Swiss-Prot record:
<dbReference type="InterPro" id="IPR004839">
    <property type="entry name" value="Aminotransferase_I/II_large"/>
</dbReference>
<keyword id="KW-0808">Transferase</keyword>
<dbReference type="InterPro" id="IPR015421">
    <property type="entry name" value="PyrdxlP-dep_Trfase_major"/>
</dbReference>
<dbReference type="GO" id="GO:0008483">
    <property type="term" value="F:transaminase activity"/>
</dbReference>
<keyword id="KW-0963">Cytoplasm</keyword>
<dbReference type="GO" id="GO:0030170">
    <property type="term" value="F:pyridoxal phosphate binding"/>
</dbReference>
<keyword id="KW-0663">Pyridoxal phosphate</keyword>
<comment type="similarity">
    <text>Belongs to the class-I pyridoxal-phosphate-dependent aminotransferase family.</text>
</comment>
<comment type="subunit">
    <text>Homodimer.</text>
</comment>
<dbReference type="InterPro" id="IPR015422">
    <property type="entry name" value="PyrdxlP-dep_Trfase_small"/>
</dbReference>
<dbReference type="GO" id="GO:0009058">
    <property type="term" value="P:biosynthetic process"/>
</dbReference>
<dbReference type="InterPro" id="IPR004838">
    <property type="entry name" value="NHTrfase_class1_PyrdxlP-BS"/>
</dbReference>
<dbReference type="InterPro" id="IPR050881">
    <property type="entry name" value="LL-DAP_aminotransferase"/>
</dbReference>
<protein>
    <recommendedName>
        <fullName>Putative aminotransferase AatC</fullName>
        <ecNumber>2.6.1.-</ecNumber>
    </recommendedName>
</protein>
<keyword id="KW-0032">Aminotransferase</keyword>
<feature type="modified residue" description="N6-(pyridoxal phosphate)lysine">
    <location>
        <position position="238"/>
    </location>
</feature>
<dbReference type="InterPro" id="IPR015424">
    <property type="entry name" value="PyrdxlP-dep_Trfase"/>
</dbReference>
């Protein structure tokens, strides 16, 4: 049978190669320290779990829910934006609950993309930013990920040389995988650019609450008039350690939110109602749960930066997110990130995410997730130190993928 058209358009999912190797090593008895997938290990706060258990006892909540999210949940998200960013949103027309931000992004692509539409997407970036539009028939044009003045000249060229004119610009700050953070001044320039060229802005703000200094990352919607052209996506997965609950939001421009809501109405009935009620309680909380999660990730970040640095693997301290973006040690860089990641599993019992999985501009890097405790992170550093010190004896039979390019 011939491969299906949409499946054929998708690039290989390179993370799966590392996952298979990791599973094989574990089956053979290896203790793999997994810094690869950004899958939080922290428990969901007990008060949120308790609310779920309470509400699930009511059989009325076992029926179909609302695709756009129950009213109380949408009001809670609007209230969060007002508290955190000073942004006023209408919960009826500017907020929709999604099954995680990933689903929201993919369905927004389905809602707004015509075959051949050009989308400006950072490289490297989280895969759904590009893949969602590829599956919807769009064309990706890669742009820089640095949120500074160097971002705009290539953007202007992309607009001039793209036929048709780009439909949308994707932003992701704090960035997954690079952990870079944007400023409000940068966002002001982005909105001015988008309005000048009549381009939609889609902002992924999944890591807004995971930051490690006294400057909370801003929302692009803080820019006056941003809702004229912008939708922003958030997630409860990292903020409240709720990845398996699948709860996120899209907020912003009424026309775009209406389009997403309509597409979703054909595809799902929303999250299980008790999950939505528990999420409402989380959003209406005093913020102490968020502060505790943030503090744990900061301690893990500091341990990783220190211990990996002593091991000979320099890891720049990320200012935000639950990830570090580290350049592959120079003697291994010629291998590319996929082969280096495989080596770490085989020789050091450590799993990381190869940078190539986030775009070709990431191939000199690996992403390290802060999803193991401090003891395990130090153990990973010791394993890597042993691997690096013995690499000259073990590398003679490793062939670089780049040698065949």
């Amino acid at each position: 049978m011939e491969e299906f058209h949409k499946v054929r358009r998708l690039p290989p999912y390179v993370f799966e190669q590392v996952n298979r190797l990791k599973a094989s090593a574990r089956a053979a008895g290896a203790d793999i320290i997994d810094l690869g997938m950004g899958n939080p290990d922290l428990p969901t706060p007990q008060s949120i779990v308790d609310k779920l258990c309470e509400v699930v006892q009511d059989p009325r909540t076992h029926r179909y829910s609302s695709s756009k999210g129950i009213p109380g949940l949408r009001r809670a998200q609007a209230a969060y934006y007002a508290r955190r960013f000073g942004v006023k949103l209408n919960p009826e027309t500017q907020v929709v609950a999604t099954l995680g931000s990933k689903e929201g992004f993919a369905n927004m692509a389905q809602a707004i993309t015509a075959p051949g539409d050009v989308v400006l997407c950072p490289n490297p970036t989280y895969p759904i930013h590009a893949f969602g539009f590829l599956m919807a028939g769009g064309v990706i044009r890669s742009i820089s990920v640095e949120p500074d003045e160097s971002f705009f000249p290539p953007l202007e060229r992309a607009v001039r040389h793209s036929i048709p004119k780009p439909l949308a610009l994707i932003l992701n700050y704090p960035s997954n995988p690079t952990a870079q953070v944007a400023t409000l001044d940068f966002y002001k320039d982005v909105i001015a650019f988008a309005k000048k060229h009549d381009i939609i802005v889609l902002s992924d703000l999944a890591y807004s609450e995971i930051y490690f200094d006294d400057a909370p990352p801003p929302s692009v919607l803080e820019v006056p008039g941003a809702t004229d052209v912008t939708v922003e996506f958030t997630s409860m997965s990292k903020t409240f350690s709720m990845p398996g609950w699948r709860m996120g939001f899209a907020v912003g421009n009424e026309r775009l939110i209406a389009a997403l809501t309509r597409v979703k109405s054909y595809l799902d009935y929303g999250a299980f109602t008790p999950i939505q009620v528990a999420a409402t309680q989380a959003l209406n909380g005093d913020g102490s749960d968020i502060a505790e999660v943030r503090a744990i990730y900061k301690r893990r970040r500091d341990v990783m930066v220190e211990s990996f640095g002593k091991a000979g693997f320099e890891v720049p301290p990320p200012p935000a997110t639950m990830f570090a973006w580290a350049k592959i040690p120079e003697k291994f860089r010629h291998l590319g990130s996929l082969e280096f990641s495989k080596l770490l599993v085989e020789k050091a019992d450590v799993a990381v995410a190869p940078g190539i999985g986030f775009g070709e501009q990431g191939d000199d890097y690996v992403r390290l997730a802060l999803v193991e405790n401090e003891h395990r992170i130090r153990q990973a550093a010791r394993n890597i130190k042993r691997f690096l010190s013995s690499a000259d004896e073990t590398m003679h039979n490793v062939i670089s993928l780049n040698a065949h390019r």
